[in-house]
């Protein structure tokens, strides 16, 4: 009888476990707590597997890739795409991933963006595998590092005679190289008239020289599920991005839309639907098709997307969000503690918008930062990989450079 009682108790226990697992709030709480515990040592430019299930696709050159169970970490440059599982109560699944991405900020202070993705989310890295080579200053004079690849651009640093730096990218004719400043993570441009290297600069990625340098997961395609959660306590599938304290404004390229934020922002996006940029703290400026608007805390902006997640409209005017849409966001699991801003009144949003600078821009149109026939195929800095430049044999064209060679100390 005793053995029979134990058997019955075991059967009862085994049937109650799935019921417990099917409790939505409990599953969310467990998934986020697991992510906190397993991912607390995630380093700069790393992704961490927080909770099941995640499926990662790697870049072709990556070997010995491991990112298959909670707690696994990898460099974000290894990841081509990342797909998270929607909530599946019967299997106890609700995908969570944490990423620490170096902030694309004009400040030289090293800082990390926090990206927390949850639920039915897919992220695809739009930055190609990085290329680099060492180059050295030629001659006995110091040379200038410039903000843009031309002799009239502002000076952001300098190099000493014979100093060696890392070059990451080049313009299409090979006349300028984008290099990392020796004293910071900031990037700048040097003329190849004054540099030499043992490698072939044609192996460097080709860029337009106007857009900022995007590192892995600073430019990505993102989509989230559209199904409403059946549990009121569960946040809708999406992505939260938080900037670090004191980093200033950070620029990202999301679904070919420029987003500049200094804040905590919640993103959702569906094919042939909208990308919704919801600012729960701070501000976010959204730019597409030559138009930009700023959503302050308590408001959101919509951008219409096509089936391939490309923008097909300018951003909407900011509008108040519904508190029910943000109340359950997992902000307690972000490094910088905040409170979700109450929705602003639409009249207040309109007043704030009137005090902002003109919202039309020339940067987007000139750089094909839109869609349709002028749609870019890359996030500004990565239009071509290596020698795939349609530039004949790839020889450096210097026919116009010698005019300034003796007039400037590198400009």
Predicted region positions:
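Bacterial N-terminal signal peptides that target proteins for export
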Residues: 1-7
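Short, polar/charged, low-complexity connector loops/linkers at domain or secondary-structure junctions
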Residues: 285-350
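Ser/Thr/Gly/Pro-rich low-complexity, disordered linker/stalk segments of secreted
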Residues: 335-411
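SH3-family beta-barrel domains
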Residues: 22-62, 66, 115-147, 157-164, ...
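SH3/SH3-like beta-barrel superfamily modules
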Residues: 155-199, 285-288, 293-296, 301-304
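Extracellular secreted precursors and ectodomains with disulfide-bonded cysteine-rich loops/domains
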Residues: 22, 37, 46, 229, ...
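N-terminal signal peptide c-region/cleavage motif recognized by signal peptidases
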Residues: 14-16
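Short, small/hydrophobic-biased targeting/export segments
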Residues: 226-301
């Amino acid at each position: 009888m005793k053995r029979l009682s134990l058997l019955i108790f075991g059967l009862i226990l085994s049937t109650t476990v799935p019921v417990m697992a099917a409790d939505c709030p409990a599953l969310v709480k467990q998934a986020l707590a697991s992510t906190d515990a397993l991912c607390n040592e995630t380093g700069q430019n790393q992704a961490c597997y927080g909770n099941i299930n995640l499926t990662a696709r790697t870049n072709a050159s990556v070997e010995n890739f491991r990112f298959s169970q909670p707690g696994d970490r990898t460099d974000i440059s290894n990841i081509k795409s990342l797909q998270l599982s929607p909530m599946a109560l019967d299997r106890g699944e609700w995908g969570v991933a944490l990423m620490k991405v170096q902030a694309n900020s004009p400040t030289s202070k090293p800082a990390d963006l926090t990206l927390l993705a949850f639920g039915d989310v897919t992220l695809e890295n739009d930055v190609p595998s990085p290329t680099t080579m060492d180059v050295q200053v030629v001659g006995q004079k110091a040379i200038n590092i410039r903000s843009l690849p031309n002799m009239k651009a502002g000076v952001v640093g300098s190099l000493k005679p014979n100093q060696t730096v890392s070059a990451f990218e080049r313009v299409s004719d090979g006349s300028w190289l984008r290099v990392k400043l020796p004293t910071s993570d900031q990037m700048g441009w040097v003329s190849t008239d004054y540099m030499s290297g043992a490698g072939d600069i044609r192996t460097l990625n080709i860029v337009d020289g106007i857009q900022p340098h995007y590192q892995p997961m600073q430019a990505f395609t993102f989509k989230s599920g559209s199904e409403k959660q059946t549990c009121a306590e569960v946040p809708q599938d999406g992505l939260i991005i938080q900037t670090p304290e004191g980093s200033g404004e950070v620029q990202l390229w999301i679904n070919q839309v420029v987003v500049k934020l200094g804040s905590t922002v919640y993103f959702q996006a569906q094919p042939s639907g909208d990308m919704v940029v919801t600012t729960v703290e701070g501000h976010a400026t959204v730019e597409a098709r030559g138009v930009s608007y700023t959503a302050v805390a308590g408001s959101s902006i919509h951008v219409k997307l096509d089936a391939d997640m490309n923008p097909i409209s300018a951003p909407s005017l900011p509008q108040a969000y519904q508190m029910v849409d943000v109340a359950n966001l997992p902000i307690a699991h972000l490094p910088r503690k905040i409170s979700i801003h109450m929705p602003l009144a639409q009249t207040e949003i309109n007043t704030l918008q009137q005090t902002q600078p003109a919202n039309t821009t020339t940067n987007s149109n000139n750089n094909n930062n839109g869609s349709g026939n002028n749609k870019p195929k890359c996030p500004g800095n990565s239009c071509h990989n290596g020698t795939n430049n349609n530039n004949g044999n790839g020889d450096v064209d210097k026919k116009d450079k010698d005019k300034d060679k003796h007039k400037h100390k590198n400009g």
